[in-house]
């Protein structure tokens, strides 16, 4: 259990801080090691950052960001996981780590300075978060 928790924390930390800051541009970093993984989405506005690491197979990551300085970090180590994140506004941050298989995480954030963290270290878990406004924080851990 500790090893899984440590691995999830390491993935979130690594992907959240791995992207370099650019003066006016967007940053997208994608690493996929297994077969049949896919990433989609888009970024509008300025200084958006997206980092995705998918180690297993048949994982899907979707991230859309609109506004300024939004950050999304998705790490999926298992297989058949879905992470679907949508952010609009300023300085919103979402981090998703799915270590097991067949997990789903869906997040929507609008406003400013909102933070969502989802860690799912099991199989077949589902989490959905919707935040609107400013300075909201949600953390979900499912073992």
For each feature predicted by the language model, list its residue ranges.
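Bacterial N-terminal signal peptides that target proteins for export
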Residues: 1-9
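N-terminal signal peptide c-region/cleavage motif recognized by signal peptidases
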Residues: 18-20
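Bacterial N-terminal signal peptides
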Residues: 9-16
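Low-complexity repeat regions of mature extracellularly deployed or surface/particle-associated proteins
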Residues: 24-143
């Amino acid at each position: 259990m500790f090893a899984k928790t440590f691995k999830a924390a390491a993935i979130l930390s690594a992907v959240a801080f791995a992207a370099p800051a650019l003066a006016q541009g967007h940053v997208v970093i994608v690493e996929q090691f297994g077969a049949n993984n896919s990433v989609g989405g888009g970024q509008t506005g300025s200084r958006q950052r997206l980092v995705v690491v998918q180690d297993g197979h048949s994982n899907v990551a979707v991230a859309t960001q609109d506004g300024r300085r939004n950050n999304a970090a998705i790490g999926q180590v298992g297989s058949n996981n879905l992470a679907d994140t949508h952010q609009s506004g300023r300085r919103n941050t979402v981090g998703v780590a799915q270590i097991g298989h067949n997990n789903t995480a869906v997040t929507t954030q609008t406003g400013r300075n909102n933070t969502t963290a989802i860690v799912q270290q099991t199989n077949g878990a589902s989490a959905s978060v919707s935040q609107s406004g400013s300075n909201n924080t949600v953390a979900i851990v499912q073992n």
